C-alpha cells in the first residue's frame, strides 16, 4: 500500500482520566467515520496532571491502563491503526512515571511502544518553567515500527528539537515520523511549525503531529495546531486551537520522489570535529 488517510485527534486533556477517555474516543470514532486509516492522539492523552503526587496516584501500570485497553478495543473493532500518542504510565520499579507512545495494529495488538527520550526541562523568558524529569523517567531507545505502509519512526514532543533522532530513524528506513505533542503556547507560537517542517524536509518524510490544545490548568496552556506535513515541508492539514480532528491523504510515493530530488540522506557523511586547544581548554 502506498497511500492511506491519516488523522490527528486534538484534545484538551485534564486531570480526570475518564473524562479524557470519553472525549478522545468520541473524536477517534469521528475520524473513523471520516475515512481515516491511521489515527493519532497527542502526548499525555490520558492524563495531564500538574501535581506529581496526584499523577502518581492516578496513573496505572501498563497492563491496567484503561485508556490503552479502550484504544486496543477500538482498533480491533474498527480495523484501524491507532497511535496513542503518549500515555502516562506507572513504572513498577520506579517512583517516576513513563511518557510512553503505543502503536496499535488493526487487530488490537500493540505493535510497538516508545518511551520519550528527551525530557522537557526548560526555563522560558516569561518566567514559565517546566521540569519533566522530576516526574518522568526518560527512555533510552529510538523505535522504528513496522506497519502495513512501511516503517514509522516514533517520537514525542520535545524530541522534535533533536534532529539527529529523526535522521537516524530515516536512515533506518522511516518514511513517516509521528510527533504527538503538548507544546506550550509560548514555544508553540515561536517554534512548532518551523521544527516540524524542518524534520519533514531534512528527512524527506511525512510528519504526523497531533497536539494538545487550550487551558489544562491555571498554569498550563498548550498551543494546538496539529499538523500533517509532506516530505517537501508543505502543510497538508492543520488544526486550530480547539479540540477536533484533521485528516490528510498520505502518498508514500512522494517520499522516494523527494529523496531522489534532494538525496541528503544518501549524501550523509560522518566527520571528525577539529577543536583548537585554546577552545578545548576554555571549555574544561
Model-derived segments and spans:
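Active-site-proximal beta-strand elements of phosphoester/diester hydrolases
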Residues: 3-15, 40, 100, 113, ...
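Short, acidic/polar
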Residues: 19-29, 161-167
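Cys-nucleophile CN-hydrolase/nitrilase-fold catalytic domain and related Cys-dependent amidase chemistry
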Residues: 17, 25-107, 113, 183-199
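CN hydrolase (nitrilase-like) catalytic-core segments centered on the catalytic cysteine
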Residues: 62-84, 151, 157-246
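A short C-terminal boundary segment appended to hydrolase-like catalytic domains
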Residues: 253-284
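Active-site catalytic loop in hydrolytic enzyme cores
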Residues: 92-172, 185-194, 261-264
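Short beta-strand scaffold segments in enzyme catalytic cores
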Residues: 84-86, 100-103, 143-145, 226-228, ...
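Feature marks short, surface-exposed loop/turn motifs that line or immediately flank catalytic pockets
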Residues: 15, 45-48, 118-120, 254
Amino acid at each position: 500500500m502506498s497511500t492511506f488517510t491519516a488523522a490527528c485527534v486534538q484534545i484538551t486533556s485534564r486531570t480526570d482520566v475518564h473524562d479524557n477517555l470519553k472525549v478522545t474516543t468520541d473524536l477517534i470514532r469521528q475520524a473513523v467515520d471520516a475515512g481515516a486509516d491511521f489515527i493519532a492522539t497527542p502526548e499525555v492523552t490520558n492524563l495531564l496532571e500538574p501535581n506529581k503526587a496526584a499523577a502518581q496516584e492516578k496513573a496505572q501500570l501498563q497492563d491496567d491502563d484503561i485508556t490503552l485497553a479502550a484504544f486496543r478495543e477500538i482498533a480491533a473493532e474498527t480495523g484501524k491503526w491507532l497511535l496513542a500518542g503518549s500515555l502516562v504510565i506507572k513504572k513498577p520499579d520506579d517512583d517516576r512515571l513513563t511518557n510512553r507512545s503505543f502503536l496499535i495494529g488493526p487487530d488490537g495488538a500493540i505493535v510497538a511502544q516508545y518511551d520519550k527520550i528527551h525530557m522537557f526541562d526548560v526555563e522560558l523568558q516569561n518566567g514559565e518553567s517546566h521540569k519533566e524529569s522530576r516526574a518522568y523517567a526518560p527512555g533510552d531507545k529510538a523505535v522504528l515500527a513496522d506497519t502495513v505502509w512501511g516503517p514509522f519512526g516514533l517520537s514525542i514532543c520535545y524530541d522534535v528539537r533533536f534532529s539527529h533522532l529523526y535522521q537516524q530513524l530515516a536512515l533506518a528506513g522511516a518514511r513517516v515520523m509521528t510527533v504527538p505533542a503538548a507544546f506550550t503556547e509560548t514555544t508553540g507560537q515561536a517554534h512548532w511549525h518551523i521544527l516540524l517542517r524542518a524534520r519533514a524536509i531534512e528527512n524527506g518524510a511525512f510528519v504526523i503531529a497531533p497536539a494538545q490544545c487550550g487551558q489544562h490548568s491555571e498554569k498550563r496552556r498548550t498551543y494546538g495546531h496539529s499538523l500533517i506535513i509532506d516530505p517537501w515541508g508543505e502543510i497538508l492539514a492543520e488544526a486550530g486551537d480547539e479540540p477536533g480532528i484533521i485528516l490528510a491523504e498520505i502518498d508514500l510515493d512522494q517520499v522516494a520522489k523527494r529523496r531522489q530530488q534532494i538525496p541528503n540522506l544518501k549524501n550523509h557523511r560522518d566527520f571528525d570535529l577539529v577543536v583548537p586547544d585554546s577552545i578545548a581548554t576554555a571549555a574544561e
